[in-house]
Amino acid sequence: MTDALLPAAPQPLEKENDGYFRKGCNPLAQTGRSKLQNQRAALNQQILKAVRMRTGAENLLKVATNSKVREQVRLELSFVNSDLQMLKEELEGLNISVGVYQNTEEAFTIPLIPLGLKETKDVDFAVVLKDFILEHYSEDGYLYEDEIADLMDLRQACRTPSRDEAGVELLMTYFIQLGFVESRFFPPTRQMGLLFTWYDSLTGVPVSQQNLLLEKASVLFNTGALYTQIGTRCDRQTQAGLESAIDAFQRAAGVLNYLKDTFTHTPSYDMSPAMLSVLVKMMLAQAQESVFEKISLPGIRNEFFMLVKVAQEAAKVGEVYQQLHAAMSQAPVKENIPYSWASLACVKAHHYAALAHYFTAILLIDHQVKPGTDLDHQEKCLSQLYDHMPEGLTPLATLKNDQQRRQLGKSHLRRAMAHHEESVREASLCKKLRSIEVLQKVLCAAQERSRLTYAQHQEEDDLLNLIDAPSVVAKTEQEVDIILPQFSKLTVTDFFQKLGPLSVFSANKRWTPPRSIRFTAEEGDLGFTLRGNAPVQVHFLDPYCSASVAGAREGDYIVSIQLVDCKWLTLSEVMKLLKSFGEDEIEMKVVSLLDSTSSMHNKSATYSVGMQKTYSMICLAIDDDDKTDKTKKISKKLSFLSWGTNKNRQKSASTLCLPSVGAARPQVKKKLPSPFSLLNSDSSWY
């Protein structure tokens, strides 16, 4: 993927009317979404403080011998655990605050669930990158102050992306730029000393790593989360809005699935493979729900084939939500998924199952065999509506027999009312769902409609009706699927392209310092030929020519000629430049390639040479004692309140005890003042 994105030649970083890529939304704007993110930031800090207090109490309990002290510490530890549980419930309340993200013109529709953006702390790239440029590339790092400032501005802007395609492009631009930065400045054999801290969007617990892959994985997660917010913002009262919502949720599922497949050892619960699998299912379920709304938007005619289609579409939505609820109820996801999300999935599963039975009942009760009716087609549709017909009934006989149709239709109404009752009951059990007024209205209206329809057709002998309505077969005319991110469609210019072509001048390759070669062309003969393009190499060097005597070697890369940078020049351009000096003395600087360094794993967001085990290993649950390449035992994942307990102290302490980065840094010269410098909080979000 990266190879397709490499720039063919240096491009100007500043383009007219293209400055938005360094800008997010105004972080000081008091919008509903910004207030929600600010509350999330405050909660994250409180959770971090509580986790540190619990870790300290556990350490004290471990070393204390006095019984009174131990009893007091145990009491304090119980208070801290209680505080953590309350903070977790508050964070869950933010995650189910769906009203903030819905379209302002939403009317009578069930809200959709968006994902909140992960938060991060500031990172100062300046000192580390300048030192590496001087050490590895033998160039003055201060010549790249503007490029480093651009990178830091871009990262800061990604903390407040706008809720539209521009915001998505901003995040994807930074993700691709991180690929360039990783290739140029992050060798696989050592850590660079940059600490990246990101907060879990579901639990609020911070994770810190010196690995750039944590940064890339978190940016991808935020890209998927932003797509979900775009999807919930779409106007679901219009055909175009619903199509946009379907597309946004499919793209969100694609980004999250790509994250799951690419970064397999993620360091936080919200990016663990199990959690991401559930989130992908949730996005596809919401896309399928939008498909049903798109079909129902023009109105549902009381016509046989239309009702069959709508009933099966509703059954499809109910089926995917039932599968989603089952996935949310499995360990280890169950311990960390917001309870309100699982409850809403269960509510929707019953609600749409009820709609499937309701529409089936209407088509059976109101059906009339009129002259010219295509009974064969209707018989085929009715037979495909069920896996099997009730005992003693056949599709054709049921269509012709009014009594059988009404009895079967009322059986469907009874099942619809049962599902409605279950959806209302499930919604009433969850405090967060009870506070969503539009959800309560939709559920009650649907339940009342089914009840009134049944009352209109109720007869005295209905208790003798022994027909059990079968389940409706789920079917859809538009099967939703993930849409993978298309990074290759986005043109991104490497900020540090002045260092040279990335395929050659990267952190994986070691170079000699530039050597100055002074020589002259004798009778127009340079004494060597050239090969390659950007950069050009010395080839077929005459051992007796002046360039060879001056120290040139075959295979050297030409980086400059008479102070003209040649790293991006083609062979013909370099040859033309050399010949332009005639027989005058030429000063040429060359570098030689040293031995290549070994590569590291590229699919683990937590792999790092020489680092002790971190919080990410809790997610992996890998047994410490098994050091062989054989299959390792998987231990049970920990719940929110069991992080950092005594028996798991070795696994959790390294990440929860976060260092503070406060070293003095040289002033970075920026092109434009950043509005983010006005913020006092490390993790302020829009």
From Swiss-Prot:
Widely expressed. Highly expressed in prostate, trachea, stomach, colon, thyroid and pancreas. Expressed at lower level in brain, spinal cord, kidney, placenta and liver. Residues 46-66 are annotated as: Interaction with Rho. SMART domains: BRO1, Hr1, PDZ. Pfam families: BRO1 (PF03097), HR1 (PF02185). Signal peptide: none annotated. Residues 26-100 form the REM-1 domain. Keywords: Coiled coil, Cytoplasm, Phosphoprotein. SUPFAM superfamilies: HR1 repeat (SSF46585), PDZ domain-like (SSF50156). The modification Phosphothreonine is found at residue 655. Gene3D superfamilies: 2.30.42.10, alix/aip1 like domains, HR1 repeat. Disulfide bonds: none annotated. Residues 515-593 form the PDZ domain. One of its GO terms (biological process) is glomerular filtration. InterPro entries: BRO1_dom, BRO1_sf, HR1_rho-bd, HR1_rpt_sf, PDZ, PDZ_sf, Rhophilin-2_HR1, RHPN1_2. Residues 111-460 form the BRO1 domain. Its main location: cytoplasm. PROSITE patterns: BRO1, REM_1. It is found in: Cytoplasm, Perinuclear region. Belongs to the RHPN family. Interacts with GTP-bound RhoA and RhoB. Interacts with both GTP- and GDP-bound RhoA. According to PubMed:12473120, it does not interact with RhoA. Interacts with KRT18. Binds specifically to GTP-Rho. May function in a Rho pathway to limit stress fiber formation and/or increase the turnover of F-actin structures in the absence of high levels of RhoA activity. This is Rhophilin-2. It comes from Homo sapiens.
